[in-house]
Amino acid sequence: MKSAIKKVIAACVVCGAMVTGLSVPVTTNVEATTIQAKKQKKSASKLEIVDSGYYVQPTDEYSDTAYVYFWAKIKNNDKKKSIDFPVITVTAKDESGNVLGSSSQTGMSIAPKDTVVLTSMMDTGDTPATTVEIKAKKPKFTSRKAIKSNVFETTNITEVPQEYTCAKLTGEVTYKGKKDLDGIAITAIYKSGDKSVFAETTYLNDIEAGSTEAFEINPLSNELPDHDSVEVYVQNW
């Protein structure tokens, strides 16, 4: 392991504020956001894409398949009802507007006035995508209570360089709820200035109430785009 480990000192807060570390500052969890992204106009569905992005990995000497990594930060603007199984859809096109592929990602739930992040990837054959369209489908509201993201707290976030692959992100997450969970999703959004440039998610199973668990996120991409900050989000899964 290289000695120059990028260490990020994350504040022990639930709603993350940007924290200046030794190299890459980290934002933990949901409601406070460090970006000044242009928010999409709220639709009648009350499901808002707060931020979204994609990263295109072209073909190279090791792979004749191109990939698109995509993500969307989505907010439930309803004050009383939760959203069950939120869905984002993705369409990748070439420079002529021809569709290279389409995909979707489905989440678990979003509590009222809460925000979660959905991520995934897709291949576009041997042609790298030129444009990628990301949309949120009309949500399904429910009176069932959803786990809020502010019951999770992340600490000790660190970017660890690796010899043959891009740096992994490690840290710890504390669950402050009172009921055990089947699992959680932990997402890192890599930022360059105000722009999100990459995102990756990992999952942990069997989370006990009051427990603290270590995690690591190993990006599947061959390399990470240049970035100067990382936001970490946790949700029930």
Positions of predicted regions on the chain:
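Intrinsically disordered, low-complexity Pro/Gly/Ser/Thr-rich segments with frequent PxxP/GP/PP motifs
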Residues: 100-127, 197-223
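Sec-dependent signal peptide cleavage junction
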Residues: 19-40
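Short, solvent-exposed loop/turn segments enriched in Ser/Thr/Gly
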Residues: 65-72, 164-170
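Terminal connector regions
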Residues: 123-166, 222-237
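Short beta-strand and strand-turn-strand segments in soluble, beta-rich domains
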Residues: 84, 94-104, 148-151, 193-201
